[in-house]
Amino acid sequence: MLVVLLTAALLSLFSMYVIRGSVLKQATDDSRSDFSSQIVRVQKHLNASNLTGTDQYQQLVSNLASELQSNGSSNLVGVYLMERDAADSAERGFVPVSTEPEYSNLVSSSMRNRMRADTSGLIYYQPVRIPRTSGGTPGAVLGSVISSNNMGSLEVFALYSYQSQQQALSQIQINMLMVCVALSVLIG
């Protein structure tokens, strides 16, 4: 009987590990897909823009941030648009735009440094803890660089929350625990 209980417990732990990995991979893939489509949308807007001054540039960046936030997936927490380098900033006087300034510190300097070295438009991923609750909510910051001939380069970041996936995993853990208890009662 003890062997059966230990086997059931080990199978439950292994199943939880596999399920957790699968759920987190799906959440990551969904975030990357959403962010990729958002980047394509922003790049099209930049390519179509014909700006003549700093005020127009600032207005476009603000509009892009609002559009990205409203068209993003349901787990999109915030959008952050920043200039790529200080030289461009001095020329245009661009003020960074954020739809959720409370979490702008989650865009790390190490991620920005990796992106500064990029010239191929890759999408960067950084897991984070969003300080909403004690212990934080799992999430991720995704970032990429887009550019336009008349405006230079723009760093685009998006913060995604994995709170719903975390809740689903907690419910699965509770259900598996209940099954183990029921199994031990039936066997014992």
Task: Go through each PLM region and give its residues.
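Juxtamembrane segments flanking the first transmembrane helix
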Residues: M1-A86
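Residue-identity detector for threonine
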Residues: T7, T28, T52-T54, T99, ...
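A sequence-composition feature that detects small, non-aromatic residues
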Residues: A8-A9, A27, A48, A65, ...
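Phenylalanine-focused residue identity feature
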Residues: F14, F35, Y80, F94, ...
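Residue-identity detector for glycine
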Residues: G21, G53, G72, G78, ...
